[in-house]
Design a protein with these regions (language model features):
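Long, low-complexity intrinsically disordered regions
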Residues: 1-291, 296-373
Length: 373
């Protein structure tokens, strides 16, 4: 199905709508996480802010309950990075992503420790985690005792990328501390978490599902976009696209083919887009090879920082227009917005209004709250 050329603003508005950044939704936190195919969770507060900006009446207790009842887990996921995902998605797609995780490990191992016996290390670590939840500091000490001549960092990474483990939530803060304990995913969830598909057909079906989910949440997009988001091999993504093609609409951005679900039409390019705050590492900023549909090229260095960090940002008229942070002093909390350029009076007022709610969400116990733009 060919639907013609798509403009930058149409791509922007499609992304905003499919990421629920035009209108907050009245659904549960697990439902939103499922629709987004996971939330980047490198920053402890990130998933909370990401849900706050997308859901009606979202409170910390909502996500805390979902992590406590194990309907949502935090684990290595897309591109090998920590994500919050639904338990159902983790069980279904851990095997789909195992090649991505393995490749991430081998890129490091071939430089630092090519002789590591990965199978032995992972099997031993499984027994170690089966005894009790462990921090990675505890795991490192134990691995060093077992294999004193091997690179402990590489062994630790082998465990993280090959053994299905999830972080154990706590009852304070943002549910997951800076130095969390990990436990076996199958014990936490009460059923096996496979690392290989049952057969080739099951593997293709799962890959198709993941690609379809991406196109629904981030499309229209191309093969290289899916690859950038998931880390899956290009040939696997291309094969999934061909299997899904009868259900997809096809667009052109210049000479590039983009695809999206045929039953999800593009929104109008003039759809109003209210100001929004995004957390660090929000996947909306990381899920396309070419990111101009939301970040202008001249702002890349202010958003994508050294050390692979991604700044918390503000959206104005649908595009990244600045960064933000919360600082505390003398019992008060201030949300500071640093715009990339001059803001219209109405946009500034809307950012202040949104920011006043956000700073109270992030620092509920502060004596005073303020917003500075």
């Amino acid at each position: 199905m060919a639907d013609g050329t798509v403009t930058l603003r149409e791509l922007n508005r499609a992304l905003l709508e499919r990421q629920f950044l035009v209108q907050r939704q009245g659904i549960t936190a697990p439902e939103m996480i499922e629709r987004l195919a996971g939330l980047q969770a490198q920053s402890p507060a990130g998933p909370y802010v990401g849900l706050w900006t997308r859901l009606d009446d979202f409170g910390r207790d909502v996500l805390a309950s979902a992590t406590a009842d194990r309907s949502v887990v935090k684990a290595a996921w897309l591109r090998g990075t920590p994500h919050l995902v639904t338990a159902a998605d983790y069980r279904r797609h851990r095997a789909t992503l195992q090649p991505v995780l393995s490749a991430g490990f081998h890129d490091i191992a071939k430089r630092r420790a090519p002789g590591i016996d990965v199978d032995a290390v992972v099997a031993a670590a499984r027994e170690h985690f089966a005894e009790a939840p462990r921090t990675f500091a505890e795991l490192s000490a134990w691995l060093t005792e077992r294999w004193p001549d091997d690179d402990v960092g590489a062994m630790r990474h082998a465990v993280r990328m090959h053994l299905p483990i999830v972080q154990v939530p706590v009852e304070t803060g943002w549910s997951y501390p800076a130095k969390p304990r990990f436990t076996l995913a199958d014990e936490w969830l009460g059923e096996p978490v496979p690392v290989e598909p049952a057969n080739a057909a099951a593997g293709d079906e799962a890959t198709d599902d993941l690609v379809r989910r991406y196109l629904t949440a981030f499309g229209p997009a191309g093969v290289t976009d899916v690859q950038s988001w998931s880390g899956l091999p290009k040939e696997d993504v291309a094969a999934a696209i061909e299997r899904l093609r009868p259900t997809l609409a096809t667009y052109k951005e210049g000479r590039t083919e983009l695809l999206g679900p045929a039953d999800v039409p593009l929104p109008d390019a003039d759809t109003p887009a209210p100001p929004r705050f995004l957390p660090e590492y929000d996947n909306v900023l990381l899920s396309h090879r070419k990111r101009t549909r939301i970040v202008a090229d001249e702002h890349r260095k202010q958003v994508y920082l050294p050390g692979l960090r991604v700044a918390p940002t503000v959206l104005v008229d649908g595009f990244v227009a600045g960064t933000w942070k919360v600082t505390k002093a003398k019992g008060g909390a201030t949300l500071e917005v640093t715009p990339f350029g001059r803001l219209a009076k109405a946009d500034r007022a809307a950012l202040v209004d949104e920011g006043e709610r956000l700073v109270r969400f992030v620092e509920p116990d502060a004596e005073d709250h303020a917003v500075r733009v």
